[in-house]
């Protein structure tokens, strides 16, 4: 195994406890238009980890929400979310100390399905932005989780291979994206998992945990040839590919 060089963290449910906040904000936005609320069980099993617009598209298909109200609900939900985040998300000294120490050894990035405004507010509340190399919100990608684009973009930005990178995720959709990226994955049960000693233990036992979780990381020590392809690759980009054209899998 190559030496680990990069760490990528999801935001919601990993660094901040926001599942209930997003649940309440969405239901408050729906109820303001006299639309039936969703249960917390459904939110966890179906909607958790998805951008708001994709949650609404599911409600559209279920005939719970008329599509014409989507834009209104998105605006209301985001406004309520920011209000709740400002009220309930607090500085976490354990997270701060963890990122302070980790940043001395690894590149750190954040990859979330949250909007940029939510991402920036949470990083400000946690006071960890200075330890992060860069961050991506759902506004920075064409395809959100469970598509792996956000993680592939992180790899390109960091200049790292999947075998050099560990992802921390919690939601079903996020885990799917992380697995499809080919990176190492640690599934977070709760925010208390994110502490320096635990993360070092995870890294030190990475090989064993990968085998236990049966996550396949692609590698081939014999492959060392890169064959460039002509053209700018605009058709590939429009089709949703993230990596530069010469690096697209065939």
Task: For the regions a language model picked out, list residue spans one by one.
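Asp-based, Mg2+/Mn2+-dependent phosphohydrolase catalytic module
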Residues: 1-3, 116, 121-214
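Conserved hydrophobic helix-helix packing surfaces used for dimerization/oligomerization
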Residues: 7, 165, 223-225
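Short, flexible loop segments at the rims of nucleotide/cofactor-binding pockets, characterized by
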Residues: 84-90, 113, 248-250
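Conserved SAM-binding loop
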Residues: 15, 45, 108-111, 143, ...
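N-terminal helical cap/lid subdomain that shapes the substrate entry/recognition surface
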Residues: 2-96, 104
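Substrate-recognition element of Asp-dependent hydrolases with the DxDx(T/V) motif
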Residues: 95-124, 178
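N-terminal glycine-rich phosphate-binding loop and ensuing alpha1 helix
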Residues: 218-250
